[in-house]
Amino acid sequence: MNKKIIILIYLIFIKSIVGQNPVWIGGSGCNLFTDSSCWSPSTSPLTTDIVTMGVDSTQTVVDGDITITTLINNNLTLGGVEMSSTISLEIIDTSLIVSGAFSMATNSRLSLSLSDSYANSLVSGSATRNAVNVLMNLQSMQTLMVGSSFTMTGNSVLDVNRSISTINGVFTMNDDTSLFMYSKQNGDSKFTVGNSVLNDASSLNFQGQSFIFFNQTNLPSGLVLNDQSKIVAIDADNVKISGVVTLNDQSSIQLTSSRLYLDSLVTATTSSILVNNSTLSILQSIPTTFSPASAVFKGSVFTIKSNCTIQSPITMIDSVYSFNQSHTLASQFTGSNVYMIMDAAILNAGNYYDCSGCSLSMRNSIANFDSYENQGDLILSSSKLNSNAPITSNTGSIFGYYGELNQALTVESGSLGVYNEKTRLFVNGNVIVESGAKIQFYLSSPLDFSWLNTSGSLDVQSGTIIEIYVYIEILNNGSMEVIKTSNGFVTPLSTDNVKLYTYDPDNDVITDFSTTGGCEYSISITNTSVLVHTDYACQQAIITLGTDGISKGSLAGISVSMVALACFVSLGVWWKTSKKNDQRNDSQVLTNFSQNKSDDIDVERKL
């Protein structure tokens, strides 16, 4: 039979130290400040008393509910709290200040919350109580303040709903204890502790927006998960955990339709990570080793901001993998329909990269593979891809502004370049474009246009079309060398496989220039080059086949080494995302959270 004691008080913070003998509280229908049957040995606890909740004046265990809510001029500051038996304590719209330790026994429950009506009033202004001016807003409201340690045992539960609480000491969860953090409206749940340890099968559970802050004044600090303990987030929109999160033993992180942002993550080789339709971001640039027994991402985003060595298998399906700085794969990476984003990064993949239908987008970056086969989009913006074997592309496109491939390239299907993006690509070797594939170049002006420069030959096989798209509003005359080869063309080019189009990007209209009757644009094909000319004083279309290449053209003065150096030069424009309509920007990657968060460029895209 549940018995309920309503404790109506309002709390202010005062400095106190733990002392006196234990005091007990229990019974039902009591006014704690007048009825001696509720307290033993006195009718009111001192600020230094250690209070045991869940027993009556004879120290007999009493199951029941205790509710602490606001009342002017009644204040409760205690030296310590021990919740025994199956007692349930609710702290609503006020603060409980404990200078010493707080412990929860088996099956006890502590709920910290602000009511909807009170939360709304807190947002609106300020008030004065007990001659203390309190800024009545959600950021200053302390629901629970514990000066020493907080320990949970048995099956005890801590509910934090739109609460702002602080534990200055160690927060320990044992057995099957659970912490639930969630927020319905008008603010986040915030929980600040010195450091935290989870043991046995205890769990942190998140829903809505929550923030746990671990004070790093005394290292080591942060969140330590032992045994089979876990972090669980379900439909948690914006969960932030500061400090170092350490997964020991068989502990785990389990995310479903949630976003979890960590400062730093340390993983044992027996831990596990499961991310489903969620985001997991590691924000600090501290070098790290990622080594859980398993890590699976489905329909999710995984972001790492630091130098990282991947020493455990990773499986990604329909997901985004984004990283900065240096990444080394020392274990198998298996993916399907993965969009990998490198921003000022170096990837050492070796022979551990196995990704089907995957895209790689690089900005100011270098990627090193034993072998590489493109099965999606390969976007090289001031970036270089190195392979120990010739590179193949059997689907999608290869494009980007100032990209370099260190090996010969075979395009089996898809396209080299795209009609609506400028592509400038160096290939150190021969280029083969097989039947059915395309070469596409976008020419926006004689000073800024696409080109292919290969140190070998270009083999455009039967059925392959070179499509050149000229921006419809080019107004100045000039020549543009769109293809430059050192060893010429394996199969002579002609107007049968080199086509000229005009392109109106504003309306996305493409017109075959051969059908317009115009002569503003013309093509020259030599033994080693393909050039496009503009002439607004023309009388007729000019298509010429020559025998001599040009020794100095629009590519003169551009060094292959520029691409490698460009990995350390920031460009003002990155790649566009219009080519992947199934992805969307998510620019909510944590503001005002950690020192590095302002650099956290939007990388989330929902596939």
UniProtKB/Swiss-Prot annotation:
Topological domain ranges for the Extracellular compartment: 20-554
One cellular component term from this protein's GO annotations in UniProt: extracellular region
Transmembrane segments: 555-575
Cytoplasmic side: 576-607
Other comment: According to PubMed:15947191, it is secreted in the conditioned medium. However, prediction tools clearly predict a transmembrane domain. In some conditions, it may be cleaved and secreted in the conditioned medium, which would explain the discrepancy.
InterPro entries cross-referenced by the UniProt entry: QS_Complex_Regulator
Function: Component of a complex that acts as a quorum sensing protein regulating discoidin gene expression during growth and development. Its function in the complex is unclear as it has no ability to induce discoidin during growth and development by itself.
Self-association and partners: Forms a complex with psiF/dicA.
Keyword DNA-binding: no
Record's protein name: Discoidin-inducing complex subunit B
Leader peptide range in chain numbering: 1-19
Subcellular location per the Swiss-Prot or TrEMBL entry: Membrane; Secreted
Positions of glycan attachment: 75, 161, 215, 276-277, 307, 324, 453, 477, 527
Alphabetized UniProt keyword annotations: Glycoprotein, Membrane, Secreted, Signal, Transmembrane, Transmembrane helix
GO biological process, alphabetically ordered: sorocarp development
